[in-house]
């Protein structure tokens, strides 16, 4: 069994939907059935609104705070709180706080390759 941290995990960046700031992600665990990623979003950043056809995700805040819009309803998460987003549910994550938000995204099955921009989905679909 191997220990892992963000120091030795596979790292990637992704652009915020707001401005030109980059956010970070680290693959802590990746298998055919499960993905665990730690992400960092600087203040004032957001991801693109999207959904997953088959993937259920659980977001868990490690530092800072997140706002997650799920199917039109906003949920504010602070330290040590989490939220499940079911498959086929449009959602968007924002950092509206004043410090970096660090959080885990646990996806089952892994979400890579299963991401549909919400603007490509018919309302009520």
Task: List each language-model region with its residue ranges.
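Structural motif
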Residues: 65-67, 74, 90, 100
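Short acidic-glycine-tyrosine-enriched beta hairpin
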Residues: 72-87
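Short beta-strand His + acidic residue motifs that chelate non-heme Fe in jelly-roll/DSBH
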Residues: 49, 68-69, 85, 91-97
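A short, N-terminal "cap"/entry segment at the start of jelly-roll beta-barrel domains
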Residues: 1-34, 115-125
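Glycine- and acidic-residue-biased ligand/ion/polar-headgroup-sensing regions
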Residues: 54-56, 60-66, 71
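Well-ordered beta-strand scaffold positions
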Residues: 32-34, 39, 73-75
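A short hydrophobic beta-strand segment most commonly corresponding to one strand
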Residues: 84, 99-115
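Conserved short histidine dyad/triad with adjacent acidic residue
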Residues: 37-52
């Amino acid at each position: 069994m191997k220990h892992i941290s963000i120091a030795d995990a596979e790292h990637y960046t992704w652009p915020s939907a707001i401005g030109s700031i980059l956010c970070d992600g680290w693959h802590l665990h990746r298998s055919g059935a499960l993905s665990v990623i730690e992400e960092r979003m600087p203040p004032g950043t957001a991801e693109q609104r999207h959904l997953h056809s088959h993937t259920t995700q659980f977001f868990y805040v490690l530092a800072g705070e997140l706002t997650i819009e799920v199917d039109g309803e906003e949920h504010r998460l602070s330290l040590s709180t989490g939220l499940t987003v079911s498959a086929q549910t449009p959602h968007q994550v924002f950092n509206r706080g004043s410090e970096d938000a660090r959080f885990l995204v646990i996806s089952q099955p892994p979400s890579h390759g299963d991401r549909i921009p919400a603007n490509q989905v018919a309302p009520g679909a």
